[in-house]
Amino acid sequence: MELSALIFKKYLTLAFPLLLLLNPVLSGQFQNGLSETYHRSSSNRSGIALGGIGAGSVELRKNGQFYNWSIMNNWPVFTGDPLVVRTFPHNSDNDSYLFFLVRYQVEDEMPGLKLLQINDGLSEAALESITYYYPWLSSVEKIEYNGTFPFVNMAFTDCEMPFEIKLQSYSPFIPHDVKNSSLPGIFFNFSIISHSAKPVKVLLVGTLRNLSGYETTDKFFASESYNKQGFKGFSMSSGGMDSTSGSWGQMGLFSDSPNCSYYIGWEHKHPYYEKLLLSQKFEDIDDTENRNKTTGGKKLAHISGNMDQRCFSSLGFDAELNKGDTLNAGITMAWNFPNLYGAQNEKSANPDKDYTLGYSLTKIQGHYYSNYFKSASEVASYMLENKSDLNKKSQYFLDNFYNSNIEPYVLNQINSQLNTLITSSTLTKSGKFAIREGLTPSQPWGPNATIDVSLYGSATTIALFPELQKNMMRIHKNLQSPKGEINHGISSDLEQTLNGTWGVYHRVDLVPNYIQLTLRDFFWTGDQDFLREMWPSVLKGIEYLLSERDADKDMMPDMDGIMCSYDNFPMYGLASYIQSQWLSAMAMTKEAALILNDQKTLKLASEILEKGSVLMEQKLWNGSYYNLSNDYSGKRGIDPGILTDQIIGQWIVHQAGLGYLFPEEHVSRALESIMEYSYIENFGLRNCSWPQYPELFPIHESDLWVDQANTCWSGVELGFAGLLLYEGKTSDALKIIKTVDDRYKKAGLYWDHQEFGGHYYRPLSAWSIINGYLGLGINNGNFTFDPRIEKDNFRLFFSYGNGTARFNIDKSEISVEVLTGSMHIKSLTVPSKYLSHEKPVVYLNGKKVKTKMVLKDDARMFLFNQEICAGNNSVVSIR
């Protein structure tokens, strides 16, 4: 024993009696028996989703287990039946859909097996009560976890294991690359490093359960082994079932690593686990046929006494390691379930079941990945052939994202929200895209692509996947009513037109939501074909709002109760939340009309904007903030509520580079008032406060069915933090972001923000924090940067319509480096304070560029028309 260990042992022997006296938990009645401590941080409530955009996913949590499977088109993400395997009640078989273990044997010693997860139940590795039935296997002692979307890094250690195991799991995530970000597959990359003084034989095993046809027993199991094209593995499916069923398809494990062997089609510990205990490697066995039987001339999967049909297959990697040696093994999980059905809401009961999902299936929409792959093995082949490039590009995005000198917790919070793009998205074969409003393991919450929630959450999609965002807006256009009304959300059939709606109607904010998003998407991409395609629907929306939603004919939308995204908030007359959005929509319409030379619309938008700005100041500004509402033409009077989102329209127009909707000093004062009244340290930023109720609005005295005022919506908080950053209120923004970050860490829901259900869409507003830091506005190739920070050296990654880039300030030089894609710059506007020369010069990769400089208040605009592509010629600088 080392000297330090001996000293520690002696100290503990002397000190322990004193500790007993000082600590009542360890003394007296608690001295005997088993004493343990369970920490809140020990809970496993959320994790990173592994899978592709719209392809389904599996959630890996820090205990090494997999949750919330959606790869088989199953409920609640998609329209298939809930994933409930037929089994004895309360048997936690779902713990064993996918698992990894390691068999090891040190020279001259008995073999041991360790399960690379920590279980809460008795079902482990497709066994039950292993302490008795299979005592050679146990879970590892310790798992160290790091999650940085899309990567999950884990280290498994155990005092009985003579090595350490590391795992990196991820699915490719590459901004602006839809194909490779929607792959139905996962990479699991293992490394085992031996610390044993003696040689140790190791067999790493990955096991997957065949879940095809999970909802029916009228099937038989089928498997296919692969040992070609440089990879080995297996694919599992089911025969004898309807090949148009949503659960029909294949799933499997594949590898291009050496020393790979398989055991396909096992069900019971006999003989699989008995062989595993004694064997150094598998024998390339396919025993699938013994999982089936023929009864009455019909072939069916064997059904146990519990009506359970079980079929597992395993992939193994063997090596003999000396001290310091490493076994590297990669496993690729791939799937192909092509029959994704659309569905329409329908409340009819299902007589065959004791529950109803509330919809009826329409037709097969398919998955985007079906444009490229016809089987799970084709998916695996593509992923393995391109694994280096897929890893490099996914890691390149992450490295660039974190190569920024802002607070790490800010970047972590933004990064964590990207998880929702995987958990909650649908991407059909034709490219239709939507994100579910909310999601819990038992049900979806709300429709797809809810337009009011998209106002916040689409800040991420327009930045990272603009083509998907534009396609989502096209669906909303197709759902617009003949008179111009915009519907709240989209059903589970993204191919439907008007009849494919889901959710509430007649909300006043829906048309302004739609106009702002449509035009923002144009400004960010510069796609004039998209603008022309969508323009008639914008005009129809304006006409609808003026003719149907303007009761007092002042050209402003009127509220009459609960009629907006705050769907438990009554507002009356002129409401700041609605008015700021309407003015934002008109400012953007005016700008777009100029581009299209639509003089009639230009005149109308200008008139509304001028009149509405006056009303906003006269009827809603009270000297400190904009009142919640003012029923100045009716009988309700003024509601002095201090809504956090009272000037959300300013947040939107900043992103479009359109300057100020309201007096700059009023914007600043309103933000200060919101922080003063509504921010509570270590709690959060409340949605709304009232001066007469400084602590809590008395919701219990009202007839409102849920408390939206006193509570915090992280999507609102993070978007508001972005607005604070645009206005240079960095300290307040950081308070809010840190509070949100800490709150969700405490809750164990870091990867699963809650509002109306979990994995809520609104918190994807977090991406606007980056835009706010940069003061970034993008308007059809005209880029504005106005970072309100007090740093001589500053760098920050950002993403835009056609690529990604890095913004740098280095003393008296400003530069933009294009990292991926291209950037078409018509003009570049930057603050004068960062430029030391009166006549600064623009350079492209060190060569002067001919420009025209225009002074704009405290900024300088440089006019030039330049396409900058990632690569060797990718840096534009001003000095």
Task: Locate the predicted segments by residue.
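Gly/Pro-rich turn-and-neighbor structural signature
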Residues: Q29-R45, S129-Y133, S139-Y145, F151-P162, ...
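Substrate-binding groove/exosite segments of carbohydrate-active enzymes
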Residues: E36-D81, N292-E320, D325, A329-L340, ...
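Non-catalytic C-terminal accessory modules of carbohydrate-active enzymes
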Residues: Y67, W75-V77, R86, N91-Y97, ...
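Helix-terminus loop motifs that line ligand-binding clefts
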Residues: M72, P76-T79, L83-A155, E467-S565, ...
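Extended, loop-rich substrate-binding clefts of extracytoplasmic carbohydrate-active enzymes
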Residues: L115-G185, H268-L315, N415, N419
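Short, hydrophobic/aromatic-enriched beta-strand segments in well-ordered soluble domains
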Residues: F156, L167-S169, L204-L208, G324-F337, ...
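Polysaccharide-binding surfaces and accessory modules of carbohydrate-active proteins
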Residues: P172-N290, L315, E346-K392, S836-M853, ...
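Catalytic cores of carbohydrate-active enzymes
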Residues: T207, I406-N415, A449, L455, ...
